[in-house]
Amino acid sequence: MKTIWCFAMLAMVFLATGICAAEVPNLLGKWTGSWSAYDEGIGYSNLTENGSFILTFVEQEDRIFAGNMTFKPENEAEGGKGFAGAIGLDNKTLYFVEFDKGYTLGTIISNDEIELIYLADGENGSVAIDRLYRIKA
């Protein structure tokens, strides 16, 4: 009986270790995709074939990351800004702060696909949903 108990305890330790040791996703690199948005004073918009959006994860140390994004809506000047964020304990949830304004919450759908929801409050409030795919080198 003691032997069975010892094996059961040993098996539980190994299983618990495997569960806790989930690998942190590597987000480094460039991602592109589409967006739909609503901006106060402008209304609804989305990415067209003449626009572009590139999100680049430049640095990542464990669950903390930083990078920059460039976007060019159709018939508008190109813009860019930096961001930093963290991956949640579930290794699926993303939290960003964009350096000029706003916050982004996201979900890692797969190694090569993420969805982001951007929120900015105040006088020029806006919301956007982005579906991004990793650009393969």
Where do the protein language model's features map onto the residues?
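Alpha-helix termination/capping residues and helix-transition junctions
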Residues: 13, 24-25
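Beta-sheet ligand-binding and adhesion/scaffold domains
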Residues: 25-56, 84-137
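N-terminal glycine/threonine-rich, aromatic-flanked beta-hairpin/loop signature
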Residues: 43-82
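Generic hydrophobic-segment detector
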Residues: 6-8, 23-24, 57, 75, ...
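Positively charged n-region of N-terminal signal peptides that target proteins for export
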Residues: 1-5
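Bacterial N-terminal signal peptides
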Residues: 7-16
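Sec/Tat signal peptide C-region and signal peptidase I cleavage site
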Residues: 17-21
